[in-house]
Amino acid sequence: MDQSVCNGISYKETGYFSQLVLDFLAEHPHIRSFYTHSPLKPDVEALIRAKKAHPQQRDVLVKALQQQYAGLDTDPAVQRNISLLEQPDTFTICTAHQPNIFTGYLYFAYKVLQTVKMAEAWKAQYPQYDFVPVYYMGSEDNDLDELGSIYLKDQTLTWNTTQEGAVGRMRPEGLDALIAQVEKLLGYGEHAEELVQLLRKAYLGHDNIQEATLYLVNALFGRYGVVVLIPDTPLFKQQYIPVMREELWHQTSHKLVSDTI
């Protein structure tokens, strides 16, 4: 095998990244003051110390997650990780993404799997701690133009719906037709039938997109212990009440932002 095909290319050579992203990855001195930790060699122990010093409501987190997973066939790895979140020496490796239908772009999977890889690597390096991979679902995003399409075999498949508002709360009406298009395009390819059945169970067997996405991500990544967090949950939003009250009475964010200008 020609080993040259296995060589990587730099982010710059792809032409897909802005200069700001390239400077960030290169840790260019002119932007280094805008962030604390290196993207290449983060000081994990410093991160842990900072998180330990920050107030945490682990009981609320675990209770909300248990409610979200109620009735779902959950892998033991996920159950274990949710339980671990109660412990003070457990920390999360998070990625966030909107609930694109059928996961949307391929990098959705890359992002989730990267949390798994980091959690495993950091556990090996710091065995006294536990690290839980978490997918934080941005289910209140209302950009259906972005979230309502997938790209398969050079074709764009779009969900035709008149619903508006938070995509995660939308009903999956009409997605049966889109799944049928996916089935036709996949044909008899490897794992095609398995994938189509998974999409049907996820989207046609649940009341809204965020529940469908939870099911889908759990089916795909639950074996790796990935925990899905849906922030559009009353128990989580109740924790934000003091922040909103502070903002209404004192406009704290305006003062903080003004100090940075």
Feature-to-residue mapping (PLM):
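N-terminal targeting/trafficking signals and adjacent low-complexity tails
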Residues: 1-261
